[in-house]
Every structure is written in structure tokens, then in C-alpha cells.
Design a protein with these regions (language model features):
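Short active-site loop/helix that positions an aromatic residue
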Residues: 74-86
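Intrinsic structural disorder
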Residues: 1-2, 119
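A short, exposed loop/beta-hairpin motif centered on an aromatic-Gly-Thr core
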Residues: 64-69
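Conserved NAD+-utilizing ADP-ribose enzyme module
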Residues: 8-16, 25-36, 41-43, 52-62, ...
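A generic structural signal for alpha-helix starts
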Residues: 71-74, 126
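Residue-level signal for short segments within beta-strands and strand-turn junctions
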Residues: 48-50
Length: 217
């Protein structure tokens, strides 16, 4: 299986490191793409970061790395089956799935004016299923605010982070933080696809806000 602590070795059949070279990443497919279910974008890129090493190092040395591109729903299922399950990962590990060549950084142009919906969850048996459902909703266009062409790329990606002490957070990154109607529509879609109870509070914070919530749902 792919995953921490050997995320780098797991994708050794394709280059890692500089995301600008993303086009050379291995495409996760064994079948005929023409006979499989196309995604709502040209491709999505799966990123990963292993458990934080005990020694202190530079922030960049512990950055997420691109692992694989996926172009069809079937390719997603194959890759998902090969990765370590979220429930087995150690503290500090992160999985991210982002649209096309968008990088999971605040500085990426697609993220610069955006923010993130944070979804608190318990580290429980259904974590693996919740992560899979969130990813499938993202790549299938089920999280977008509307069917309008202008909204199709509003959702930039989704993430899973395991924090110290067992805290867990799912996230959905969006493009336009000032469009409140769109952000609230995304939140409602998140609730629907994850079957979240009303008492689960979602918070939306701009990437540069140091965690201060702009919207809640």
C-alpha cells in the first residue's frame, strides 16, 4: 500500500518534488480511459504528506508531494484502494486531492483569494468512507455551488489532516471567499454528501485569516 511513512517511495515510478513538473506524474489507470467515467475536470492530482518526523527541519522539507493524476472515476477507486487508509495514518499525515494543476498551497493563484470549509470529525471507523465520499463528490462536481459554467471550478480541492492528540479535520478549498452565496451552497453540498448531523458545525476561513471564521454553517 502507498502511504506514510513511505509516501515518497510509494510513487517512485514517477517523479516527485517540484509540482511544476506535475505533467510527468504517473497516471493512475489500468483500464481504457475511453470506456471509463470522465471527471468534471481534465484531471485531479492526489497529494500526500507522511507523519511529521521527530527532528525539526524546514517547512518545505515536510511539504505535500504530488503522487498521481487521476482522469476517471475508476482510476480514483484503483488509487484509493492502493493507498493507506486514513484511519491507519499517524499524526501529522495529510492527504489532498486537487483539481488539475492547482497546488495545495495558499499561494497558488486559484487559492489566493479563497478559503477552506473545515469539517470536524471523530477518528472513527467511518473516517475512511467519509474521505472517499468527499473525494468522489469533488471529482464528480457534486460540491460545486451550481451547474453554471462559472461555478464549475469553484471547488479547488479537498484535504484530510490528522493532528496531534488524535484530532481530525476534513477540508474543502474554494476559490472565491467573498461570494457568500456560493460558499454556503458548497457547505450545504458537503453536509448532503457526508450525511452530517445539524450539530456538526462547519466553519469557513480565508487562507490568510489565521483561522478566523468568515462563515459558519
Amino acid at each position: 500500500r502507498l502511504g506514510p511513512p513511505s509516501l515518497r517511495r510509494a510513487a517512485s515510478n514517477g517523479p516527485l518534488g517540484d509540482a511544476a513538473a506535475d505533467r510527468a506524474l504517473p497516471v493512475a489507470t489500468d483500464g481504457d480511459p475511453s470506456k471509463e467515467t470522465a471527471l468534471d475536470s481534465d484531471h485531479w492530482t492526489f497529494w500526500g504528506r507522511g507523519q511529521r518526523p521527530p527532528e525539526r527541519g524546514s517547512k518545505n522539507a515536510w511539504a505535500s508531494e504530488p503522487l498521481h493524476k487521476i482522469r476517471t472515476a475508476e482510476a480514483f477507486f484503483r488509487l484509493h484502494g492502493a493507498l493507506e487508509k486514513p484511519s491507519t495514518l499517524g499524526n501529522g499525515a495529510t492527504y489532498q486531492l486537487f483539481r488539475n494543476d492547482v497546488e495545495p498551497t495558499w499561494e497558488d493563484p486559484s487559492n489566493a483569494n479563497g478559503g477552506e470549509w473545515s469539517i470536524p470529525l471523530e477518528r472513527s471507523a467511518d473516517l475512511d468512507d467519509q474521505w472517499k465520499r468527499l473525494c468522489l463528490a469533488a471529482i464528480g462536481g457534486q460540491l460545486t455551488p451550481s451547474a453554471d459554467d462559472a461555478d464549475l471550478d469553484e471547488v479547488c480541492g479537498c484535504s484530510l489532516s490528522l493532528k496531534k492528540g488524535g484530532a481530525l479535520r476534513l477540508g474543502v478549498w474554494t476559490k472565491h471567499r467573498t461570494d457568500e452565496a456560493s460558499q454556503r451552497a458548497v457547505a450545504e453540498n458537503i453536509r448532503r454528501v457526508l450525511s452530517l448531523q445539524k450539530e456538526v458545525a462547519l466553519t469557513y476561513a480565508p487562507h490568510d485569516s489565521k483561522g478566523d471564521a468568515l462563515y459558519t454553517s
